[in-house]
Amino acid sequence: MMPISIVKALIQGQPPARRLFVPLIFTLAAKLEDVPLSNFVVNPTKIANSLAAIHQRLRLDGVTCYFDLFLVAETLGCQLNLSTSPPALERPTRETALKMLQQRGDVKQRGRLPVALEVVHRLRGTLRNSPALVIGLPGPLRIAQQLFGQDVLRELAAGDDDALDSFETLVEITLSVAQAFCLAGAHLLYFDELDVPVEFLPEWQETMVAVWKTVRFHGALPVLSIPRALQIETNSSTDAMHLPEELKGRFEDPANAPLLCLKPASGEQAPLSGMPFALALPVTGETFPDVSPWLRAKECALVTTDGEIPYQLEIQKLQQQVAAMRSLFEGT
C-alpha cells in the first residue's frame, strides 16, 4: 500500500495496512550538494534535487521537504545565524517581540516560508504519488519561548493576560502556516513542541484543537512530538494506555487529535489502547534501545526519529544509520 494511502487511512481513523517508516532527514541533504547550509536552506532547487536523490537511494515512506524549528520565528522578524552549528536565534526584546506579533502581516510571504512551500510544490510534481511529503514545524509554545524567553512558560502557567494573548496569536500563525503547507500538498505535519506546563495544559490542548482539525480537514496528518508532558503511561496490570487526567476525553476523538509521537524507555511495555501512535527513535548514539514491544503493537502506525537526523552526521553514514533503524522493525 502506498504511503499516501496509509496516511489517508489514518486520517479517516482506519487501521493502516502497514506502519510507515519516516526518519526526518533535511539539512543533512545539503552535504549531497556540497554547499553551505546557509545557501542550501534558501535554494528550493538544490533542496528538491538533493531530497529526491536521497529518496531514490533510501526508499523511505516519507520525504522531509523542510524541517526548521526556527522557521516561524525568523519569518516574524527574528535574526537567525545559519553559519553556526546548530543555527543560533537572536532573541528580540520583549517590546520588539510584541511588535512582531502586532505587525506580522502575511507570514506565508515572508522569510523562508515561500522557499519551503516551493519545495513541497516541486517534490509533489517530481515524486508523484510515491512518498508522503513531510514538514517539520515548531509548536506555538516553542515559538513563544524563542520570542519571549523561558519566563513566558511561567507566565502562561500563571494565566498572565499578555502571555495568553501572545500565545493565541502564535496559534493563529501556526494554523495559517500549517494550512499553507497542506494546500501546497504536504501529507504529514510534524509539530515539535515544548513541555507544556501542567497548569496550562487544558488551555493549550483546547486551543490546539483548531490546528489538528484544520490539518486533518485539508487531508494531512498532524504528528505531535512533546518531551514529557503528554507522555502516555502504561499500566502493567491491565496493559492499558492512560492519558494524564487533564487530557482524558480530549485525545480520545481522533478527529480532534494529532498522532502522538512516543519516546518510550528501553524495554518498556507498549500500550494497548486501540489508539494509533508514532514511535520516535533517537537520532544520536551508535545503538538503539530495545523498543521491540512497541514495534510489535499493532497501534504503532509510524516509526520516525526524535527530531531531525543531525547535520553533523557524516553523509556517508546516513545509509548505515537508516538501515540500523529499519532493522529494528523488520519482521515485527
Predicted regions and their residues:
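N-terminal amphipathic alpha-helix/helix-capping segment at the start of soluble metabolic enzymes
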Residues: 1-28, 36, 117-129, 162-165
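Catalytic-face loop-and-helix region of soluble metabolic enzyme cores
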Residues: 6-12, 32, 216-332
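Alpha/beta catalytic barrel-like cores
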Residues: 17-118
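Active-site mouth loops of central-metabolism enzymes
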Residues: 33-46, 152-176, 278-286
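Catalytic domains of carbohydrate-active enzymes, especially glycoside hydrolases
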Residues: 46-68, 176-188, 238-242, 249
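Active-site-proximal loop/short-helix segments
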Residues: 70-80, 134-156, 184-207
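Active-site-proximal, glycine-rich beta->alpha crossover segments in alpha/beta enzymes
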Residues: 81-180
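Alpha-helix-loop-beta-strand connector modules within alpha/beta enzyme cores
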Residues: 89, 108-131, 200-224, 328
